């Protein structure tokens, strides 16, 4: 059995040459990743305004259906429709050809209200070292993979990264994190199966602090079916972290699978009831037409989307930019 606080960093890293293959232009990756969502929305919008020259009640009813079936969510859809109704009432006449641009503007405004910044130039705060990110989410959403990709990108930016395997209930979770640690070339702190997750978090932060780390990413169990147990576990992890670093965690990031649409929204609501969430990472947007869920989740939770996953590659986890997201979604070919 591995002893407490053991590193599972291999001295023999995997071939790092593969990463060069994924070094694509970020905007191209975003456009490609949102292609299915964009095509679906455009097709539905075309049907919504078919035979109409101006935006009227029928068009708005059709638009409501377009947004709901694009996984924007009912409450957020009604909010967008209300804003467009107000513009129609104010301007008296809006042609259907203007609808695309108006919709883009309203969605961008909505994302701005929810603190979803244009994160193009986001930097680690200089006064928080190490910067600690507690990562939560149910199993299967791409949580550990997201941690691995973040570790890669932070390391590539010249940061010293530590990973903590605090999902001690699943051997596969620890093994997967260790594989990512080897692949990226960063240490992973782990304990034996069934250990106290808070103890793993303590060891990880202690080691990271002692070794001058810049970033710490802590993986956690996603046992949402046991809400009270999960709530207590996350509270204990946070309390123990503060014994090492009083400001920790700096960020609690919820990872959601965008391809599940409204299920992701339900998970987000349930996790928000369990612990305070400060940022969202929405994965698997490249293989789905359900990208509208990004808009609804951000609006309803009032939590900023920070990262979006647009493919399998290391570079395909991007900092979220509301401006680029909306531009890609509504860009006419």
Residue ranges and their predicted role:
Residues 18, 119-121, 150, 266-268, ...:
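Short beta-alpha junctions and helix-cap segments that line functional grooves
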Residues 31, 35-166, 173-193, 201-209, ...:
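Primarily NTPase-proximal linker/entry elements flanking Walker-type ATP/GTP-binding cores
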Residues 9-46:
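N-terminal accessory targeting/assembly segments
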Residues 74-76, 170, 286, 314:
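Short hydrophobic/aromatic residue motifs in ordered secondary structure
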Residues 176, 196-211, 225-331:
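Conserved catalytic-core segment of NTP-binding enzymes
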Residues 221-223:
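Short glycine-rich anion-binding loops that position phosphate/pyrophosphate groups of nucleotides
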């Amino acid at each position: 059995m591995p002893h407490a606080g053991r590193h599972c960093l291999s001295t023999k890293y995997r071939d790092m040459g593969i990463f060069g293959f994924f070094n694509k232009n970020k905007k191209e990756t975003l456009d490609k990743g949102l292609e299915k969502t964009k095509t679906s929305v455009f097709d539905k919008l075309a049907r919504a305004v078919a035979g109409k020259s101006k935006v009227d009640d029928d068009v708005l009813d059709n638009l409501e259906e377009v947004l709901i079936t694009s996984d924007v969510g009912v409450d957020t859809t009604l909010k967008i429709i209300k804003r467009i109704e107000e513009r129609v009432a104010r301007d008296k006449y809006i042609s259907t050809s203007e609808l695309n641009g108006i919709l883009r503007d309203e969605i961008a405004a909505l994302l701005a209200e929810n603190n979803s910044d244009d994160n193009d130039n986001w930097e680690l705060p200089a006064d928080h070292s190490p910067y600690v990110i507690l990562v939560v989410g149910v199993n299967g959403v791409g949580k550990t993979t997201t941690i691995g990709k973040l570790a890669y990108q932070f390391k590539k930016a010249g940061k010293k990264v530590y990973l903590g395997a605090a999902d001690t209930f699943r051997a596969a979770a620890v093994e997967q994190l260790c594989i990512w640690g080897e692949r990226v070339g960063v240490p992973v702190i782990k304990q034996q199966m069934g250990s106290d997750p808070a103890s793993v978090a303590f060891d990880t932060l202690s080691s990271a602090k002692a070794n001058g780390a810049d970033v710490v990413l802590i993986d956690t169990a996603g046992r949402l079916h046991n809400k009270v147990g999960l709530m207590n576990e996350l509270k204990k992890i946070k309390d123990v972290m503060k014994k090492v670093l009083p400001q920790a965690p700096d960020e609690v990031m919820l990872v959601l699978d965008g391809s599940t649409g409204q299920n992701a929204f339900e998970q987000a609501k349930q996790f928000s009831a369990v612990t305070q969430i400060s940022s969202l990472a929405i994965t698997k947007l490249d293989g789905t037409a359900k990208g509208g869920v990004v808009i609804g989740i951000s609006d309803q939770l009032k939590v900023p989307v920070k990262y979006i996953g647009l493919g399998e590659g290391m570079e395909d986890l991007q900092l979220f930019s509301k401006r680029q997201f909306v531009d890609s979604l509504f860009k006419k070919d």
